[in-house]
Structure formats: C-alpha cells, structure tokens
Amino acid sequence: MRSWKVGVPLFLLCSVAFASESRLPFGTVFKGRDQFNRLVAKAKAGNWKALPIGERTAAVGQALVGTRYKHFTLEIDNRIESPSVNFQGMDCWTFFEIALGFARMLNEPESNWTPERLLHYIEMDRYRGGECTGDYLSRLHYLEDWLYDNDRRGLVEDLTRDLGGRSVSHSAREMTAGWRHYRYLAANRSLLGPLARMEANVSSRPLYEIAKSQVARIEPKLRSGDIIGIISRDRGGLRSTAHVGLALRTSDGVLHFMHASSPSNYGRVVVDSELSKYLYRYGSDSGILVARPLR
C-alpha cells in the first residue's frame, strides 16, 4: 500500500514448505493486549454493539486514532502463515481490517470479546474463503481480490459500479516486482510462480473506479464505516489499488478519510481531510472503490 478473512480452528496451521501442522506462539500472532482491553472497555461504555455495523466500525476506527504506522506487520514468520493482530502498530490495511473485525466481534456476547475471537474474525476477512490454510497465498494480498472474495461471501457489498464507477485497465504485480521486501517470499522463492498466477487471475477481473473528479458528487451517498480503496495510475496508465481507509462522517456532515498514514506523512492513524479533497493531494491517485460492510 502507499509508500513503501469463518473457518478452521485458528491455530491449526500448515507450513508453507511442509505438510505437517505447526503453530506460532500466541505472543507472535497477537500484540497489544493492553490496547485491546482498553478498546473493549470503550466499546462497553459507549454501547457500540447497538450501532449498525458501519457506524460501529467507524467508532472502533476513531478509537484507534493515534496508533503508530508500522510496515509489514503481517510478515511474522519465514514459513507459517497465520491470522495475526498488532495493536501496537498498523498499516493502512490492518487498520481497517482490525476496526471491522473488532466491530463484528461486538455482535457476540461480551464473554466472547477476546483476542482469540478477534483473530477468528480477522481470519474470516483476511483469507480466501475465510480460511487460513497456513499457505502464504491463502491470504488475500490485493485489495481488489479482497473485495471480490468478501463481496462474494456476503460480508461486504461492492458499491463502486452502483455509484458510477467505470471499468479501468489495471494490473496486480506489486508483489512479484518487489518480492525481496516480503519476508515469506524472500525465504520461499518457490512461491513466486504461484503468486504470479494469482496476480494474473486478479488482473483478469474488471476493476471499477469512481474517478476522483466524481467523488464530491457521490460523497453524500457514502456512510461512516464504508471501506474506501484508493486507486492510483502508473506512468503507463494502468491502475492498481494503492491505499485504503474508512469513511467517517463527522457531526458537521463532512465525509472524512480515516486511515493509517505512512511515516512520510503523519506516521499514525488519523482522521484526514474531506475524502474528495484528500484525493487531490497525490497526482497519481485516480479514484476510489467503495465497499460497505454488511455483517
């Protein structure tokens, strides 16, 4: 992303390189128990569980404002892929994902508001078909692939076309091009071939974009908690998803972009400017996609 997913039991994991089951220590897959406990206390005090899922997601996101930005928080082992959560540092993807997963957890009885249950909802969201197989490629690495999978399973609704989005030429290739930056790929180069095939599959599907010149027009139709994917354009004109955050409508009616901002900017989770104005901050940003949480 800028600057540079209800499945099997959580910790029954397979090695990327081997067929035998393996486990990662809980301290590796979950960081920030104190922050989690404070968030649970805020959820109880504010009765967040009574809110619709979108507003609930936005409330969690607001409570995470100020959390420092941290790259590659999901690259936690050389071989084993596992659902994980880090409240001590987030990138743009894990910010929206943790906010949404925590909001979903609040549907359950308070006795189930635990780190283990949050990891369950992260698995449901983050992995193809909602299941982490232990294979690095079971994770949904591209936002457009995440949207396709989560929309298909009824977890979110892709609103992009209904809001006037048009199909654009695009390419998913960031990971094979920059594989040395990814711990799992650097340690398991045999994954590059399957990864390239996965990227080709993602690139073969249509990508719909609401042009940034049209975002001000459709902003009144957006709601707090909508997931906003930022699409950028490369020098050749191909689009790719480059950043992601949440919509937040404040009491004055303004629709803000709430996101984990990279160290070259704020370096933390922030409530940024009005979405339509934010998009003009970067010349390469060409538009957005929109997903609305359903449950």
Language-model features, listed with the residues they occupy:
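Intrinsically disordered, low-complexity, compositionally biased regions/tails
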Residues: V8-F11, R249
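Hydrophobic h-region of N-terminal signal peptides that target proteins for export
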Residues: F11-A19
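Cysteine-nucleophile amide-bond enzymes
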Residues: A19-R295
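Bacterial N-terminal signal peptides that target proteins for export
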Residues: M1-V8
